[in-house]
């Protein structure tokens, strides 16, 4: 089994996305985010092309349970622990990257 992000501090953040961003946003279950992160066809940007600091990694993968692509943002700390920072339904740009268009 491959490593998955630790969502200890961010579970509520991704699972209650629509409360912060509006009803058009999709809440993301941790299980969906992990499934997308482990997708064998996932596309990874290290560093994340949208990162201001260059410390985060963007992984775009498919979640069968959700039925759509999910973008997962992770960060490794100084102890090499993998933390989930956020996850959201992939936008059009990330979908194109995943489909290699």
Where are these regions (language model features)?
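Ribonuclease/tRNase effector modules and their secretory precursors
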Residues: 1-101
């Amino acid at each position: 089994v491959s490593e998955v992000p630790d969502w200890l501090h961010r579970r509520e953040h991704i699972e209650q996305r629509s409360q912060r961003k509006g009803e058009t946003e999709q809440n993301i279950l941790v299980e969906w985010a992990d499934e997308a992160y482990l997708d064998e066809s996932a596309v990874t940007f290290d560093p994340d092309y949208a990162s201001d600091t260059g410390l985060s990694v963007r992984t775009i993968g498919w979640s069968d349970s959700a039925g759509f692509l999910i973008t997962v943002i992770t960060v490794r700390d100084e102890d090499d622990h993998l933390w989930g920072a956020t996850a959201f339904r992939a936008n059009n740009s990330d979908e194109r990257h995943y489909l290699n268009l």
